[in-house]
Regions:
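Short linear sequence motifs
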Residues: 38, 146-147
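Short phosphate-engaging motifs
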Residues: 62, 153-154
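N-terminal active-site beta-alpha-beta segment that forms phosphate/nucleotide-binding
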Residues: 2-129
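Short, solvent-exposed loop/turn segments at secondary-structure junctions
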Residues: 58-60, 139-140, 175
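Surface-exposed, charge/polar-rich loops and edge strands
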Residues: 1-9, 13, 20-24, 116-120, ...
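Short polar/charged helix/loop
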Residues: 150
Length: 209
């Protein structure tokens, strides 16, 4: 079921407003380091065997410099790339990353695994085998609501994650609002981590019942 026209309008307005605020946010590198240090300290991260990182672009929270640290900690690091499923729909594939040298610019100039490596069976990964997913977004709220870029890549992927997989949104504090309009296909986060706070989302509250 698609979002209603009202929800789409509200999402678009919030996306435009917060995109500008995020682009203007000072010291993104320093705040990104603070955010990722919080993530590394989470029990959920420490317990996870396979962690999905996104490969940051533009003004997103920077993640790339923490991938080598995750590998050093013994994590299986998985990264997404744009592909098509058997029906021809655009989806995110997952790749088991061992070194940043395995990446190259891809769709939207976002880094992704080199095409020559993706078909290797040992490099292909199923989202159901991921224990924690770091999720990008444009807008989040304190309940774990999320607005992405509007392409629905992550919405499709997150709906396939295991119920016990941790969904962790990464954002600067300026990206967090009181309430995000959520449609029927949208997925709440377990946690939203900023440079100032760790917010517990509705998905985590539901799992605890």
């Amino acid at each position: 079921m698609a979002d209603s026209a009202g929800v789409r309008t509200l999402k678009g307005e919030l996306r435009n407003w917060i995109s500008k605020a995020r682009a203007a946010e000072p010291d993104k590198d320093g705040k990104s380091r603070a955010i990722l240090e919080r993530v590394l300290a989470l029990p959920a991260f420490r317990d996870a065997r396979a962690v999905q990182f996104y490969l940051d672009t533009g003004s997103e929270v920077r993640t790339r410099s923490f991938i080598p640290r995750a590998l050093e900690l013994g994590k299986k690091v998985v990264v997404p790339y744009c592909t098509r499923d058997e029906r021809g729909e655009e989806v995110l594939g997952l790749f088991a990353l061992e070194d940043l040298d395995e990446l190259e610019p891809g769709a939207f100039r976002i880094l992704e695994p080199k095409a020559a490596l993706r078909e290797r069976p040992a490099k292909q990964w199923d989202v159901r085998d991921v224990d924690l997913i770091l999720v990008p977004g444009v807008v989040f709220d304190r309940r774990g609501g999320r607005i992405g870029h509007g392409w629905a890549y992550y919405d499709k992927l997150l709906r396939l994650a295991r119920p016990d997989c941790w969904l962790v949104g990464l954002a600067y504090e300026c990206q967090v609002v009181d309430e995000v309009p959520m449609g029927p296909q949208d997925v709440y986060m377990d946690l939203v981590v900023t440079e100032q706070n760790v917010y517990e989302g509705l998905r985590l509250a539901t799992r605890r019942r």
